[in-house]
UniProtKB/Swiss-Prot annotation:
Residues 15-42 are annotated as: Disordered. Keywords: Ribonucleoprotein, Ribosomal protein, RNA-binding, rRNA-binding. This is Large ribosomal subunit protein uL15. InterPro entries: Ribosomal_uL15, Ribosomal_uL15/eL18, Ribosomal_uL15/eL18_sf, Ribosomal_uL15_bac-type, Ribosomal_uL15_CS. Signal peptide: none annotated. It comes from Treponema pallidum (strain Nichols). It comes from the Bacteria. Residues 23-35 have a biased composition (Gly residues). HAMAP family: Ribosomal_uL15 (MF_01341). GO terms for cellular component: cytosolic large ribosomal subunit.
């Protein structure tokens, strides 16, 4: 007995278009590519923003302002709640231990501690930045906070 659940509905699978097989086939000669020009050639790919050879919009419009990307500091964010689960009382939280415990990936240059979650253990925190609320929570739990400069690492 056939399993009718495996049969695709009518019109779901369309037949492949066969081109370049004689002019009487309807798609012979130019194979549906039109006549000559860049689009008719193999490997044709006009880049994004190409306007047929005229000066593209992104080059006609003047540049304004500046980008601060090169100078932006990128921080890996770790919340106080995550420190609660991973660290034992009295342990030191620094770049090395955060990478070892898998809370931070090694490629991010700076680390910042934020205040989401609760902390009950006293821990020593030595990272680049700590938010004011996170610092309060760490100190209320009996820990200490030391913000280090990137050059010291």
């Amino acid at each position: 007995m056939a399993d009718f659940h495996l049969i695709a509905p009518k019109g779901a699978n369309r037949a492949r278009r066969i081109v370049g097989r004689g002019s009487s086939s309807g798609r012979g000669t130019t194979s549906g590519r039109g006549t000559k020009g860049q689009q008719a050639r193999a490997g044709h790919k006009a880049y994004v923003g190409f306007e047929g050879g005229q000066m593209p919009l992104y080059r006609r419009v003047p540049r304004r302002g500046f980008s601060n990307c090169a100078f932006k500091k990128e921080y890996a964010v770790v919340n106080v709640g995550a420190l609660e689960f991973v660290y034992a009382p009295g342990e030191t939280v620094n770049r090395q231990t955060l990478i070892e415990k898998g809370l931070v990936k090694g490629r991010v240059p700076f680390i910042k501690i934020l205040a989401d979650g609760e902390l009950t253990k006293s821990i020593v925190v030595r990272v680049d930045r700590v938010s004011a609320r996170a610092q309060e929570k760490i100190q209320q739990a009996g820990g200490s906070v030391e913000c280090i400069e990137a050059q010291e690492r």
